Swiss-Prot record:
Keyword Nucleotide-binding among record annotations: yes
Catalytic activity annotation: a 1,2-diacyl-sn-glycero-3-phospho-(1D-myo-inositol) + ATP = a 1,2-diacyl-sn-glycero-3-phospho-(1D-myo-inositol 4-phosphate) + ADP + H(+)
Chain intervals for the UniProt region annotation (Activation loop): 425-451
The keyword GTP-binding is assigned to this record: no
Organism of provenance: Oryza sativa subsp. japonica (Rice)
Assigned protein family: Belongs to the PI3/PI4-kinase family. Type II PI4K subfamily.
Name this polypeptide is given: Phosphatidylinositol 4-kinase gamma 4
Gene behind this protein: PI4KG4
Length: 565
């Protein structure tokens, strides 16, 4: 399974290597100089053309720095450059602008070092680095606090590690505990997880009290609140057995001393929660104050200036609510969620929880989602092997919720039996937006999306009811804004009407997604046409009836066109 993180580029030695198409051409009228910004690195100049596509910019970053295009996320003015075929000018990039670059790398190891007195050291070290490099980083960061290199001795599994040993060689041995002995004396204990290394510096006198990690979570004293507890706005809400079991397992892990481990994946704070044995991940916690562009975001993204999230139509701090909403609205074909029946699209059990900072007396609120063992993501393999029904179940969810961030990296691939592959959708913090502007579905270009819905799938679509969904979310404590409610009603309407006419997920999804940043999607055109057709003060019900009539006209026209081919 691949891991991810914020990569670090060294400053450019020669800005000519980033000239458009590998040529100097420094004085072209169409060219501008932008700066790539990453945490801990000075902004790096890069010359591009106004007519360059986002894909070509990513390709040049790959060509000169080796970062594969599919691993790159470019952010400008608080929004992601998500449409690869759009020009940089479409996003408003001008001379001197700063472009934030997030890169996911398979061999990047995040290392956190924390002393008993609260002093923290954080590093990002590639697997190809050796133990000596880690010592250098630690000494440079700590100064005289941890002594010189000659005072440090790393011991793993009873044997001293040599300075020339690679981090990758140690990682191959699985979960590892490394001890760093210092003359004073002190030691550093390092726990190696799937994607994260957590190092704790312990002095003898403070050893019994050290119970903190990146989240500052600690084992609670008697009489104190549980380290994790669900947030239930309505006392009538009954959490599913799967959600309760996930919460209990998370609490057991923390109480046994296995603290959350920060993942290097994603553009926000993501933490793996361990089970009671500490050997397996049981859940994934995403604090709202560490979301992209939130005040405590650990990835170096700028703070939102207007409250809007990374995707247009979303708000910073609402990602956890959207994660939970996706689970609530993923209805089973039969039965109900409270009976522990899985949803049609397979969204893992998710709940809004409060994680306590026992040391600080405060807490973090966020989404807690069941960790799903997997064989990687759809990003790691070609889509042709995926069953049609598995792809289409995710397409239905994304169309309904107008997902603004569906890519291959947030669809997990699991083995269901010997030959059958099962897809699990995750990361729904950008669903249910207030507008359709940023809807993106990577499955749109997979062959399964061009297959018609089967009878069972079509029947499920026919049973969907947006008004009931809105009422259900309100019952659980989230009253959708009028804009979000309108988007949900329109997207559900489109899905149902499209399926009735025999349209494929590709046909329907294409109506929701823009082809370029500047060119509005067909659904946006339908909404504008409806707005022009009604009088000021018209009720929402009348407006939706107008949308329905215009949508019928467009879909009938499309259905006739498709029958000719």
């Amino acid at each position: 399974m691949s891991s991810a993180g914020i990569a670090t580029l060294s400053p450019l030695l020669d800005q000519f290597c980033f000239a458009p198409h590998g040529e100097p051409r420094l004085q072209q009228l169409d060219s501008i100089v932008i700066f790539l910004a990453m945490p801990g690195v000075a902004p790096m100049p890069m010359r591009v053309l106004h007519s360059d596509s986002v894909a070509s910019v990513k390709l040049r970053i790959q060509q000169f720095k080796g970062f594969v295009t599919t691993k790159q996320r470019l952010v400008f003015s608080g929004h992601e450059l998500s449409l690869n075929n759009s020009h940089v000018r479409d996003y408003g990039l001008t001379d001197g602008n700063v472009l934030h670059l997030v890169v996911r790398l398979a061999d990047l190891r995040a290392i956190s070092i924390e002393t008993a007195n609260g002093k923290k050291f954080q590093f990002q070290v590639e697997s190809c680095c050796n133990v000596g490099y880690l010592k250098d980083k630690l000494s440079a960061e700590s100064g005289q606090q941890l002594g010189s290199l000659k005072d440090q001795r790393l011991v793993f599994d009873g044997e001293e590690l040599e300075d020339n040993q690679l981090i990758a060689d140690i990682s191959k041995k699985g979960a590892a505990v490394i001890h760093l002995f210092i003359r004073r004396p002190a030691k550093v204990q390092t726990q190696q997880g799937d994607k994260e290394t957590v190092v704790t510096v312990v002095t003898p006198k403070d050893n019994d009290n050290l119970q903190t990690d990146a989240l500052n979570l600690a084992k609670p004293a008697k009489g104190k609140p549980a380290p994790v507890e669900p947030i239930i706005a309505n006392g009538k809400v009954k959490l599913s057995p799967a959600v309760m079991e996930m919460i209990y397992s998370t609490i057991s892990g923390i109480e046994n001393g296995y603290l959350p481990v920060m993942s290097t994946e994603g553009s926000g704070g993501v933490y793996f929660m361990k089970d009671s044995s500490g050997e397996s991940n049981v859940a994934v916690f995403k604090p709202i104050d560490e979301e992209p562009m939130a005040k405590n975001n650990p990835r170096g993204l700028p703070l939102s200036t207007d409250g809007e999230g990374l995707k247009r139509g979303t708000r910073v701090g609402e990602g956890a609510l959207r994660e939970v909403a996706a689970y609530i609205l993923d209805h089973p074909v039969y039965g109900c969620k409270s009976c522990d029946v899985p949803g049609f699209s397979g969204v893992p059990p998710t709940a809004l929880v409060r994680c306590f900072h026992m040391g600080k007396g405060s807490n973090k609120v966020g989404s807690l989602q069941l960790f799903v063992d997997n064989n990687g993501s759809c990003e790691d393999m070609g889509p042709r092997a995926f069953p049609v029904k598995e792809v289409q179940k995710i397409a239905i969810l994304d169309i309904r919720l107008a997902n603004a961030d569906r890519h291959a990296g947030n669809i997990l691939v699991c083995q269901d039996g010997e030959d059958h592959l099962k897809l699990i959708p995750i990361d729904h913090g950008y669903c249910l937006p207030e507008k359709f502007e940023d809807c993106t579905f990577e499955w749109l270009y997979w062959p399964q999306a061009r297959e018609p819905f089967g009878p069972e799938t079509a029947a499920y679509i026919g049973s969907l009811d947006a008004d009931k969904d809105i009422a259900l979310l309100k019952f659980h404590g989230w009253a959708l804004s009028p804009q979000c409610a309108r988007v949900l009603r329109i997207s559900t309407m489109l899905l149902k009407k499209g399926a009735e006419r025999g349209l494929t997920p590709y046909d329907i999804g294409s109506i929701l997604c823009r082809q370029t940043v500047k060119k509005e999607s067909e659904i946006e055109a339908i909404i504008e046409e409806a707005e022009d057709a009604i009088l000021p003060g018209t009720s929402e019900e009348t407006f939706l009836e107008t949308i329905s009539e215009i949508m019928d006209f467009h879909l009938d026209k499309l259905a006739v066109k498709l029958k000719k081919f």
